[in-house]
Design a protein with these regions (language model features):
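Bacterial N-terminal signal peptides
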Residues: 12-23
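Residues within mature, well-folded domains
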Residues: 25-213
């Protein structure tokens, strides 16, 4: 079974490398390491894992690191394939189709990140909020302060429907929480996450099933 699991892990790595080809290399790093640090895989990384990737200098380091990365998140190492990796690829593809913004891949946007970590929202809510807006005007003039309406989009997840590992994390942090609400500010060319960052951090930590590997 271990040999089969190792082969499955290598296949997952090879699959992911095809996604990394879409990343942008950074000076001093291989394209593989740059793709890891700058691409959608970073949404799944613990802070210490991101630091490890940023120190990589060879493709061999990146490939070895990836095998360990996915092995730590494999829900059943004795079976071929890795459901966590498979779900990740599917969600990246969906995010790229649905949420691209001003030339940015959908999987690298705020909504793409949430889709990758939590899945599609069972409930969507929309609202508006009036916020200050100002025009600087000419030098020496007072800025013209007005207000404008912005669109708020909320993604709602019932805690009872979350994966077991995430439910356990939430129970430790917020035992009375019934639903997670993530709120986005939606503008024509960009979307920003306003509320819910803590739930994404919990989801990242809950995805690590074998911390010691």
């Amino acid at each position: 079974m271990k040999a089969r699991s190792a082969r499955a892990g290598r296949l997952a790595v090879l699959h992911l490398l095809s996604w990394l080809a879409l990343g942008c290399p950074s000076p001093g790093r291989t394209s593989t390491a740059a793709g890891l640090a700058d691409g959608p895989t970073r949404w799944l990384m613990l802070p210490e894992e991101l630091r490890q990737v940023q120190r990589m200098r060879t493709n061999r380091e990146a490939v070895d690191w990836l095998e360990t990365f996915w092995r730590r998140r494999d829900p059943d190492p004795d079976l071929p394939g890795n459901d966590t990796a498979r779900t990740f690829y599917q969600r990246v593809e969906a995010a790229d189709r649905l949420y691209s913004e001003a030339g940015i891949r959908g999987s690298l946007t705020a909504r793409g990140r949430v889709l990758i970590l939590l899945g599609p929202p069972p409930v969507l809510r929309y609202g508006q909020k009036r916020v200050p807006a100002w025009e600087p005007g000419r030098p020496g003039d007072r800025p013209d302060i007005q207000t404008r309406d912005v669109v708020l989009e909320s993604w709602v997840y019932a805690v009872e429907d979350c994966p077991r590992t995430l439910r356990e994390r939430i129970a430790q942090e917020e035992p009375d929480l019934k639903e997670m609400v993530l709120v986005f500010l939606v503008e024509p060319r960009r979307t920003e996450l306003l509320e819910g960052e803590k739930y994404l951090e919990l989801a990242v930590r809950a995805s690590v099933l074998d911390p010691g590997s």
